[in-house]
Amino acid sequence: MKGNEILALLDEPACEHNHKQKSGCSAPKPGATAAGCAFDGAQITLLPIADVAHLVHGPIGCAGSSWDNRGSASSGPTLNRLGFTTDLNEQDVIMGRGERRLFHAVRHIVTRYHPAAVFIYNTCVPAMEGDDLEAVCQAAQTATGVPVIAIDAAGFYGSKNLGNRPAGDVMVKRVIGQREPAPWPESTLFAPEQRHDIGLIGEFNIAGEFWHIQPLLDELGIRVLGSLSGDGRFAEIQTMHRAQANMLVCSRALINVARALEQRYGTPWFEGSFYGIRATSDALRQLAALLGDDDLRQRTEALIAREEQAAELALQPWREQLRGRKALLYTGGVKSWSVVSALQDLGMTVVATGTRKSTEEDKQRIRELMGEEAVMLEEGNARTLLDVVYRYQADLMIAGGRNMYTAYKARLPFLDINQEREHAFAGYQGIVTLARQLCQTINSPIWPQTHSRAPWR
């Protein structure tokens, strides 16, 4: 990828950063990719597409150190759980065998595993060596008859967040728009004017949480044409250009896809969240409004009233235990505000939230939820997090796995909220699961013991 192409990806017109006196998202600084490179960002964005073979072209470490670190669930194929790599070594680089190894790897994968498509991820070594991925992809596609698509996001291009952009850009240019959607089944109970097709962008089905939302959409006569990329299928993503509306779930990752689909196909979109009762209801209302169906609006309101009543009833045993509790939330992106909303729905107070991967719009939503004086943490080293905990007397820390031992060493209750978690927190059912996990975490009998003297002292 050329330098001007990278700069074009950094300059995102739909991003709130562009309204400031700078061009798009900030360029990476030396050493700033230590927490995740562009390759990692591209791979983690597309890896949930379950029927595609994801082939990493590079040394074994690039695949082995990053594979399957997002807990996206699949309702069907599990080909994406297999790690494929060309395993380039020193001799391959010296002898210039990278392109040949790549071609034979694609042919072997197609012959043995029969994927819907093959995605090839570029990494630093072949990018510096100058391997022509596009030429190899064209030759392999001709030889196998299966779509072979290059994802050019070598690690040294920039940060993990930058890597999301080329992955989405390739989907718009090479995948979406290549197939027409299947007709609605004849057994459907909805009249033609009540049927609506939508697309989901940046929804990754962590721990299967979108399966809490899918039945609600089915009940309303809303079909998800394609999801980019949670529980996704290659053929379904190809049909997303026919969606009547798109919902953007994580703006930092794939806002360029939502903007491009609006420009190319006129598809309206909005950014929403399924974390918490209020956010889920708002998302359903916004979908109904974008689809412009008065009957759908009425049915949506009836469904929301029913689900909110059921959720409130299920939350009663947990609310008293959580009301007034203080939490430090250190995450990023859409979760920096959407989880705040969910915790407030439970009667909790968020003393501070992390904004390391948040956009300006995310920060504005945080201020709307927490007030203008909201504490936002750009950096989250252990000392900073614990200082906030002690200053505001937080009852627990809610963050990603890398902060777990910071909390445990401070004898502080900890709940994992990031992509590695095993529990689904989205939707009306998810908020009940979140409340249960919070109560079990805070009320664990281990915490009083950690603060008491050992019996032999």
Swiss-Prot record:
InterPro entries: Nase/OxRdtase_comp1, Nase_comp1_CS, NifE, NifE-like
PROSITE patterns, sorted: NITROGENASE_1_1, NITROGENASE_1_2
Keyword NADP among UniProt keywords: no
GO molecular function: nitrogenase activity
SUPFAM superfamilies referenced in this protein's UniProt entry, alphabetically: Helical backbone' metal receptor (SSF53807)
Top-level taxon in the UniProt lineage: Bacteria
Ranges in coiled-coil conformation: none
Record's keyword terms, sorted: Nitrogen fixation
Keyword Metal-binding applies: no
Pathway linked to the protein: Cofactor biosynthesis; Fe-Mo cofactor biosynthesis
A biological process term (GO) from this entry: nitrogen fixation
Family: Belongs to the NifD/NifK/NifE/NifN family.
Function statement: This protein may play a role in the biosynthesis of the prosthetic group of nitrogenase (FeMo cofactor).
Entries under PANTHER family matching the protein: NITROGENASE IRON-MOLYBDENUM COFACTOR BIOSYNTHESIS PROTEIN NIFE (PTHR42956:SF1)
Protein name in UniProt: Nitrogenase iron-molybdenum cofactor biosynthesis protein NifE
